[in-house]
Amino acid sequence: PIAKTDVVIYTDGACSGNPGPGGWAAILMAMGVEKEISGFEPDTTNNRMELTAALEALKELKRPCNVTLYSDSAYLVSAFNENWIQNWQKRNWKNAAGMPVSNRALWEEQKQHKMTWRKVRGHADNPYNNRCDKMAVNEIKENVP
C-alpha cells in the first residue's frame, strides 16, 4: 500500500454579525507545496464558517492522508478531541440538551483521513492562522457591498 501523505492544514472562519455574511479560508501544506483556498456565504454563522474551512480543505485531498489541522476554533477542535461527534451519533445526532446538532452534514464529511486536531490562539503570533483570518475577512469585504 502507498504510504499516506502527511498534510498540515490551517483554517479560519469569520462572520460579520452572527448570523450574517461569512468567509472561510484554509492553507494546505504537503510535500513542500502550499495551497490557499477561501470562500464566502451570504448568510451563515461563525461556527459554520470554522467548520466549512476545515471541510473544504479536506475536500482538496484526493486520497486519505495523515492530516494535522490547526484551528483557533475551540468549537471545532473540541468536537473532535472531546468525542462530541461520537456522543452525538449515540444520541441520534442530538446534543446534550436533546436538540438536533447544527451542521450535521458538515460534521459527517471528515471520516476518511487520519486526523490530528490542534488548537492555536487566534489573532496571536501564528503567521498561517493570521493569513487565514485575513483571507476569510477579505471574502466578506469582497462580497458584501
Show where each model-derived region lies.
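A short, polar/acidic, helix/strand-boundary loop motif
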Residues: 32-49
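A short acidic-Thr-Gly-centered motif at the start of a beta-strand
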Residues: 1-4
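Acidic two-metal-ion nuclease catalytic site recognized across multiple nuclease folds
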Residues: 141-145
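Structural detector for hydrophobic anchor residues on beta-strands
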Residues: 9-11, 24, 37, 51
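RNase H catalytic domain
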Residues: 7-8, 14-21, 55-135, 140
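Acidic, metal-ligating active-site segments
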Residues: 21-30
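Short amphipathic alpha-helical face segments that pack within enzyme cores
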Residues: 48, 52-56
